């Protein structure tokens, strides 16, 4: 994103830190579900929840070796979690994480855009009411036409 054209709230949604946090949340939720089904031990989920962390620079470093973003992420998380990390990503594919993350990011971005549209529409309504009697030159097919008003 080009900083001068980007809203900080939108940039935050797409930053690597946010992406990897969503990945960690997805992996943790998957482990929680597997623990509820008795597939993995509940203690492992507790450890993953408590110790689960990552460092973007370290993930980038690992990815230079592995040439795989998800493997790099999982390797870095395992450095924090330890032995229970073997249950992370069990039964999942990279697409499970990437596609779910993208859906979360798109939902957050859409919510931000819709909130902005609501503010824009409110401002337009205010201006339309404010200028309902302000006369201006009408236009039709790119040329001057009958007078109209800026507002409603």
Regions found by a protein language model. Give the residues of each.
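A helix-coil-helix interface module used to build multimeric assemblies
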Residues: 1-152
